[in-house]
Regions:
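Membrane-embedded helix-loop-helix hairpins and adjacent transmembrane boundary segments
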Residues: 1-483
C-alpha cells in the first residue's frame, strides 16, 4: 500500500463530499426543478465541463487506452465517432432542446419533455422511459464503480470489492445531499483534473521513450497493430458510437440546464474543445503505453501503470485521482438522471399526484441510493464483464432508444406521440436482440437499433393521425423562441 497516494485519494474524497454538503446546506426551500436541473442557472464553463465529465467516464482513462494498447489503431474509430457525435449534438441538438424543454411545460426530465412535447395526458411514455433509465443506468453506473475498485486494488492493494463499496458510498453521499448543483460543480472540478492527467502522463512518457528511457521497449504487437483500416466492421462500429450522444439523457439534460442561448454557444465551444483533447490523449495513452511499458498482464491498468512508473507518489496520487474523477462524475449524473426519471415520471404521476416538492426530493434521493446499490452488486459480480463492455451495452440502449426520437421531436413538426413510443420501444428492442443474437457480426448494436428506431418512429407517425393544432403551435413557439 502506498500511504501517500492513499492520503491524496482521501483528501479528494473529502473535497467531493464537502461540495455535496455545501449545496445541501443551501438547499432549504429548493424545489424539484432546483434539485434535478439546477434551476436552469448553469453557466457556460460549468455546463460544458459537467456535460463532458459526465460523458467521459473511467473508460476514457482505462477502457479506451486498454483497447488501443491491446488491439491497435483500429480502435481510434471509437474516438473519431464520439468526437463527431459530440460536436453535432452541441451544434444541432443543444440549442433546440433547451428551447423545446421550456416550451413543453418547462420540462425537467427527458421523459417528461417527450410527454409534454405532444401535450399528452398519457403517462405511458414516461413510464417506459423511466424503466429503461433504471435498468440501463444501473449497468452503466456499475462500470464506474468497477473502475474505482480496479484503481484501489491496483494502487493501494485493498480488495477490489471493498474499494467498490467505499466509492459507491462517496458517490451516494454527495449526489444524495446536493442534487444537480453538487453534481455539476463536482463534475466541473473533475473535468479539469481529467484533462490535466491525460495531457501530462502521455507527454512525459513519450519524452522518456524518445530519450531512451522506456521501461521495456516496444512490445510485440498483433498483425496490423499500426493500421487503422484493417477492419471495416471496426470502422463502422467505432463511428456508430457517435450516435449515442443524441439520446444520452445524463448528457443532454445539461443542455436543458443552461441559463441562456448565449451561454449555450460558449458552452459548446468549451465542451467540444475539451472532449476533442480528452479523446486524442486517451488514444495516445494507449499507443504510447505500448511503447513505454512493453507487455503488461492487464491492459486495463496501462494508464495507471504508466503514471506510477513516471511520477513520484504525490503527483501520481493527484493524477490517478482523475480516474476517480472520471468514474464519479459519470456515476453521479447517472444516479441523478435515474432519480429524476422515477420521481418526476413514475412516483408523482402514478402514485402521488399531489406530492409536494419536499416529498419529490426525498423520493429522488431514495432512488439514488437504490440504483447505486444495484450498480454495486453488478460491479462486484466477477461475471459482469469489462468496464468497456458495460459502458458499451448501456450506451447502445440509450442511443438506439432515445436518439432518433429526441431528434425527430426537435426537427419534425408532424412527429407524433405514437411515433415516439414506437421509436423508443423498437430501438431498445432491436439493440438488445442484436446484442444477444448477432454480436458475432462485429457490428455494434447501436447502429441497427438506432436506424430501426428511426424507421419505426417515421412509419408510426405517417401511418397515424396528424398532430393537433395545439401540438404544432407548441413546435412553432419553441422554434421561434429567442432565448
Amino acid at each position: 500500500m502506498n500511504v501517500t497516494e492513499l492520503v491524496v485519494f482521501i483528501i479528494y474524497f473529502v473535497f467531493m463530499v464537502g461540495i455535496g454538503i455545501y449545496f445541501f446546506a443551501k438547499s432549504k426551500g429548493d424545489n424539484e426543478k432546483d434539485y434535478f436541473l439546477g434551476g436552469r442557472q448553469m453557466g457556460p464553463w460549468v455546463s460544458a465541463l459537467s456535460a463532458g465529465a459526465s460523458d467521459m467516464s473511467a473508460w476514457v482513462l482505462m477502457g479506451l487506452p486498454a483497447s488501443v494498447y491491446a488491439l491497435g489503431m483500429g480502435q481510434i474509430w471509437i474516438a473519431v465517432g464520439l468526437a463527431i457525435g459530440y460536436a453535432l449534438s452541441w451544434i444541432f441538438e443543444a440549442p433546440r432542446l433547451r428551447k423545446f424543454s421550456i416550451a413543453a411545460g418547462d420540462s425537467i426530465t427527458i421523459p417528461q419533455y417527450l410527454t409534454n412535447r405532444f401535450l399528452s395526458k398519457s403517462k405511458f411514455l414516461q413510464i417506459i422511459c423511466a424503466v429503461i433509465f433504471l435498468v440501463a443506468y444501473a449497468i452503466y453506473a456499475a462500470s464506474s464503480i468497477k473502475a474505482c475498485g480496479t484503481l484501489f486494488s491496483t494502487v493501494i492493494g485493498i480488495d477490489a470489492t471493498v474499494a467498490m463499496y467505499i466509492a459507491a458510498f462517496i458517490i451516494i453521499a454527495y449526489t444524495f445531499l446536493g442534487g444537480f448543483n453538487a453534481v455539476c460543480w463536482t463534475d466541473f472540478f473533475q473535468g479539469l483534473l481529467m484533462l490535466a492527467a491525460l495531457l501530462i502522463a502521455p507527454i512525459f512518457a513519450l519524452a522518456l521513450v524518445k530519450n531512451g528511457g522506456a521501461v521495456a521497449g516496444a512490445a510485440p504487437v498483433v498483425e496490423g497493430y499500426w493500421d487503422a483500416f484493417t477492419s471495416w466492421s471496426d470502422i463502422i462500429s467505432g463511428l456508430g458510437w457517435g450516435l449515442g450522444y443524441f439520446g444520452m439523457p445524463h448528457i443532454i439534460i445539461r443542455f436543458m440546464s443552461i441559463r441562456s442561448n448565449k451561454d449555450l454557444r460558449k458552452s459548446s465551444v468549451i465542451g467540444i474543445s475539451w472532449t476533442f483533447i480528452i479523446l486524442i490523449f486517451s488514444v495516445a495513452s494507449g499507443l504510447i503505453g505500448r511503447m513505454f511499458l512493453g507487455e503488461i498482464s492487464d491492459s486495463s491498468v496501462v494508464f495507471i501503470t504508466m503514471v506510477r512508473t513516471i511520477f513520484p507518489a504525490v503527483v501520481s496520487g493527484i493524477l490517478l485521482s482523475a480516474i476517480l474523477a472520471a468514474a464519479m462524475s459519470t456515476c453521479d449524473s447517472q444516479l441523478l438522471a435515474s432519480a429524476s426519471a422515477f420521481a418526476s415520471d413514475v412516483y408523482k404521476p402514478v402514485f402521488r399526484k399531489n406530492a409536494s416538492d419536499k416529498e419529490m426530493l426525498w423520493a429522488g434521493r431514495i432512488v439514488v441510493f437504490i440504483i447505486a446499490v444495484i450498480a454495486l452488486l453488478i460491479a462486484a459480480n466477477p461475471n459482469s464483464g469489462t468496464i468497456m463492455g458495460l459502458v458499451e451495452n448501456a450506451w447502445g440502449v440509450f442511443g438506439a432508444a432515445f436518439g432518433p426520437v429526441i431528434l425527430l421531436s426537435l426537427f419534425w413538426r408532424r412527429f407524433t406521440f405514437g411515433g415516439a413510443v414506437a421509436g423508443i420501444v423498437v430501438g431498445a428492442l432491436v439493440d438488445v436482440l442484436w446484442l444477444v443474437f448477432l454480436k458475432g457480426t462485429g457490428v455494434y448494436e447501436i447502429i441497427p437499433g438506432f436506424f430501426a428506431g428511426l424507421l419505426a418512429a417515421v412509419i408510426a407517425t405517417t401511418a397515424g393521425k396528424a398532430p393537433s393544432k395545439e401540438v404544432e403551435a407548441l413546435y412553432d413557439t419553441a422554434v421561434a423562441m429567442k432565448d
